Amino acid sequence: ISDQKKMTDIQNLSLDDLLPRARVAEDVIKNASNKTLFISGAGGSIGSEIARQLLKHSPIQIILFDVSEINLFNIERQCQAIKEAQNLSTEIIPILGDIRDKKNLGYLFKKFQINHVYHAAAYKHVPLVEAPHNITKACENNIIGTHNIALIAAEHNVESFVMISTDKAVRPSNIMGASKRMAEMFIQSLNSTASKTKFSMVRFGNVINSSGSVIPVFLDQIARGGPVTVTDKDV
């Protein structure tokens, strides 16, 4: 019998296998149960996980908002599968749209009685955003887009608005970080003036297994037979 091994013989690792700590206990039920939730960037790495986790707590409606048709299609299918598996009554509403379109946002917030907003829509890939021909669009999306959805949320007296930010907003050294920091500053200013909406932010570091992060890149490179590449010789 040959002792040669194939790639298909290697057991797949879950993310839990790679993490040295236990999962953090969730405390989101009061913000999700029997509420209408709006998730911008719902098809992205972070937005889709927010959607999957919040859905388990039985909101009345969960509005999945994304500019990407294929990402929206995928997260809607995943949420429908969770709904069926757990026998939930939540209405799942996938909506194609752009946070830069303030008029459309106003229409949606008027149509749906939204209680909580989770704003995860952003351009986040540093090298792409840093390219001279992408800077303007990145700033429009990350700054103006955040400005639009936050103002609309305040105008419609949404209970809470959570902006998903990044650790790169701390003393930013690139366009992505600077654009997110400017968005943060606007959210902070709204929190001191908006009477009914509670605005807050959470800064993420590098999110394991997110799109464009090292794990999916490495897995793809290994599956193709290598080589596995890094961004700097000193890494």
Annotate each language-model stretch with its function:
Residues 189-197, 222-223:
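Active-site-adjacent segment of SDR/Rossmann-fold oxidoreductases
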Residues 205-210, 232-235:
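Glycine-rich "substrate-gating" loop/helix at the edge of Rossmann-like oxidoreductase active sites
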Residues 217-235:
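A conserved pocket-lining segment of Rossmann-fold NAD(P)-dependent short-chain dehydrogenase/reductase
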Residues 94, 138, 161, 199-202:
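Hydrophobic/aromatic anchor residues within beta-strands of the central parallel beta-sheet
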Residues 39-40, 65, 117-121, 161-166, ...:
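SDR active-site strand-loop-helix element
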Residues 2, 119-185, 189-190:
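Conserved Rossmann-fold NAD(P)-dependent oxidoreductase catalytic core, especially the SDR/UDP-sugar
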Residues 2-113:
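N-terminal Rossmann/SDR dinucleotide-binding element
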